């Protein structure tokens, strides 16, 4: 069982003629959704409201083949939302998430342990770390340590969103703590250059390897992904319509292939192909049938 831990948000993406389509998304959720489409058993650990919108999200998980048993409900909050504005294939996000119930997804250590029970892989992101606060981060890191002791592996995508952190020092401290319980690191080079001052993807990989992370893939946008100790894998050129969800789908393609026993280099090949397909569609989630055909 793969467990994704993070925030689910309501997404409004341009649908043409000045209209917006509604969907559910979030970086860890996107990765988990793509993993489920690729045939992996998946569970989402999050916290949402007790309103009709949150009911719709839980139904969405079930319809997507994702176990919703680790979704807790908060009667005093609801889901955050964001709106995508496009400039060509690039996008700008407007967020409304201050009252998001997911900010309290890690408040209860027992609930974390229950949600992570039976996991073979747990996927976490830097956005999750940013929104759950100091106590939540401590609870989550400790819960991940217990999950690893039970045999789970942990994958982490730093996915830096500077505006969610009080300052860079807090973000670096939080990342350092979670890397102590991380087996697979999936950073993006531009984030690492911003937060850590890394000059090259190789410098990022070397820094994380020195922290004891076993498996490292450094993404570099449309450029080559670096597999630490293995080499680089280049992406094929595609005409991008919307790059939302590209990194999340890359993570899913890579993890799905590794779980099937493929090498890191081969797994990057699938990851690039999946991400290249995803950017051809609007919003974070490509059509399910398109993704399932790649399984």
Describe each model-derived feature in a short phrase:
Residues 1-66, 239-240:
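Glycine-rich phosphate/adenosyl-contacting loop at the front of the ribokinase-like
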Residues 150, 160-230:
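Conserved phosphate/ATP/ADP-binding segment of small-molecule kinases
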Residues 8, 158, 249:
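Active-site metal-binding loops of divalent metal-dependent hydrolases
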Residues 41-42, 68, 154, 216, ...:
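Hydrophobic anchor at the start of a short beta-strand
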Residues 145-146, 197, 201-295:
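Conserved phosphate-binding/catalytic region of the ribokinase-like
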Residues 12, 41-127, 295:
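Conserved N-terminal subdomain of the carbohydrate kinase-like
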Residues 38-40, 147-151, 181:
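Helix C-cap/helix->beta junction micro-motif
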């Amino acid at each position: 069982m793969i467990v994704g831990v993070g925030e689910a948000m309501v997404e409004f993406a341009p649908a043409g003629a000045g209209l917006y389509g509604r969907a559910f998304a979030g970086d860890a959720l996107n990765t988990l959704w793509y993993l489920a489409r690729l045939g992996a058993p998946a569970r989402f650990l999050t916290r949402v409201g007790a309103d009709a919108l949150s009911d719709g999200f839980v139904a969405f998980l079930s319809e997507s083949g994702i176990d919703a048993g680790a979704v807790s409900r908060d009667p005093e909050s609801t889901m955050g939302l964001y709106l995508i504005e496009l400039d060509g294939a690039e996008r700008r996000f407007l967020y409304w998430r201050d009252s998001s119930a997911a900010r309290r997804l890690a408040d209860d250590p027992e609930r974390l342990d229950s949600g992570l029970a039976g996991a073979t892989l747990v996927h976490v992101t830097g956005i999750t770390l940013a929104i759950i606060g100091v106590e939540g981060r401590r609870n989550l890191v400790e819960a991940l340590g217990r999950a690893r002791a039970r045999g789970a592996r942990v994958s982490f995508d730093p996915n830096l969103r500077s505006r969610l952190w009080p300052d860079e020092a807090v973000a670096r401290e939080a990342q350092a703590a979670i890397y102590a319980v991380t087996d697979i690191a999936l950073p993006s080079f531009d984030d690492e250059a911003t937060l850590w001052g890394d000059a090259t993807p190789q410098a990022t990989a070397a820094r994380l390897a020195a922290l004891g992370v076993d498996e490292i893939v450094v993404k570099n946008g449309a450029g080559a992904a670096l597999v630490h100790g293995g080499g680089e894998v280049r992406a094929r050129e595609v005409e991008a319509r919307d790059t939302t969800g590209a990194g999340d789908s890359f993570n899913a393609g890579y993890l799905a292939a590794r779980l099937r026993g493929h090498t890191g280099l081969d797994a990057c090949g699938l990851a690039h192909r999946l991400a290249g397909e995803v950017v051809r569609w609007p919003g974070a989630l490509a059509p399910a049938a398109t993704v399932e055909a790649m399984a």
